[in-house]
A protein has these predicted regions:
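Nucleotide-state sensing region of NTPase/ATPase domains
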Residues: 1-47, 53-63, 119, 156-160
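Conserved D-loop beta-strand region of ABC ATPase nucleotide-binding domains
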Residues: 251
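Walker B catalytic acidic pair
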Residues: 223-225
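Conserved nucleotide-binding/hydrolysis micro-motifs of P-loop NTPases
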Residues: 6-7, 37-38, 144-146, 254-257
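Structural motif
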Residues: 32, 219-221
């Protein structure tokens, strides 16, 4: 059996050989649009980081190692802070800084290309005709600390605050994608429908980056395509699919495509 559960663990085989999840993702790359994705703009920073990271996992072979190493080191540093092991913290700062800086480079690069593809799709679909906010929204990548300082400097400068709070308060684990309209958080301004179309466009833009920059033919999977979308946004999504030059798989409870 290619997929089975043994002792509570999922075991996956490819050509009769056990493979890791990372290997499977690269053999059968895919991106997903589902109900939670429709709330991308209004979701937590953690959700937006995960959505970005999932695409980078597919695109960059070294990202997985960098990601896991950073978060293991971060956990170790936070443990030292909780136990007041001050003398050991400086040793871990350097390693956390190296891994965190590299992780940040991966994210910023993928974000930049996603933003380019997002703007391309907005112009292509002329969505501003009925979603005027596209002409005023500004999208920024916040790396999790002040851009004017290195991550190592931030770790050193925040040492007393970290010790007081027993956790690392700045770094890639605090990064986010921020959306502003006239310097105001866009979530305070956009309607539910506007947030949905924004989220759909952003997800499709990430998908296009995989093809255009990395030449990865990822499958786009759209779950329950109609449930969260009104007819106007649904029609925009269908137009978008014409510009996705990969396989698309979707589920739909309603019979939306009968001729």
């Amino acid at each position: 059996k290619p997929i089975k559960i043994k002792n509570g663990y999922l075991i996956i085989k490819l050509n009769n050989k056990r493979v890791t999840t990372n290997k499977l993702i690269r053999e059968f790359p895919c991106t997903l649009i589902h109900n939670n994705t429709f709330s991308f703009a209004n979701a937590s920073p953690d959700f937006r980081r995960k959505l970005l990271d999932r695409s980078i996992f597919i695109a960059e072979n070294n990202f997985s190692k960098t990601w896991f190493t950073f978060y293991r080191t971060l956990k170790q540093r936070n443990t030292l802070l909780k136990n007041n092991r001050i003398s050991d913290i400086y040793t871990w700062n350097k390693k956390l800084s190296n891994d965190g800086t590299l992780l940040n480079i991966f994210r910023k690069d993928f974000f930049k290309h996603t933003l380019d593809e997002f703007n391309f799709l907005v112009d292509l679909l002329n969505t501003s005709d009925f979603f005027a906010f596209f002409g005023t929204i500004k999208i920024h990548f916040y790396q999790g600390w002040n851009d004017d300082c290195s991550f190592l400097d931030i770790l050193s400068n925040n040492y007393k605050k970290d010790l007081l709070r027993k956790t690392t308060i700045a770094g890639p684990h605090k990064s986010d994608i921020k959306f502003l309209i006239n310097n105001i958080d866009a979530r305070q301004i956009l309607s539910r429908g506007e947030q949905k179309i924004f989220s759909v466009l952003w997800s499709c833009a990430q998908h296009r980056v995989l093809k255009k920059k990395y030449n990865i033919d990822a499958t786009l999977i759209i779950d329950d395509v109609k449930s969260e979308l009104d007819d106007r946004i649904f029609n925009v999504l269908i137009d978008l699919l014409n510009h996705i030059n990969n396989q698309v798989i979707f589920s739909c409870i309603d019979d939306c495509f009968s001729s």
